[in-house]
Amino acid sequence: MAQLKHRLRNFLNGAEGGVTVEFALWVPVLLAMLFLSADASMLFSAQSNYWNISRDTARVVSRHAMTAAEAEVYARERAQISTYQPDVRVLIDERANTVTVTITADTHALMPFDVTGLALGRTMSVQVTQSLEPI
């Protein structure tokens, strides 16, 4: 009986395997942080890309090098990520003498992991307005 108590006390006081258990408990948290940072990086990258595409498209239209319909196709093709194409609108306001390019994307389509589920039903929109140059 004393020998059994001694073995039980040694087992309970021993630290063997404790690191493995702690690691197993922390793995989901570490993976969630990794996936969350990857999702945020993808969103920031897409937003930066959409700003550049909108600015470039507005500049081309403001110089009268494209019509609004041509500019929408141009921007949509450049904004495509894999198989996903965001919504692109080009509006020329003759009275205000401006062109506005708007790119709207579903954030869930841009985030590869969406660990938190926050991207469902949310959109990211980028809008650039530029003055039309005189003809």
Regions of interest found by a model, annotated:
Residues 2, 55, 59-135:
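Short, conserved structural patches
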Residues 2-75:
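Alpha-helical assembly-interface signal, strongest on the long, hydrophobic N-terminal helix that forms
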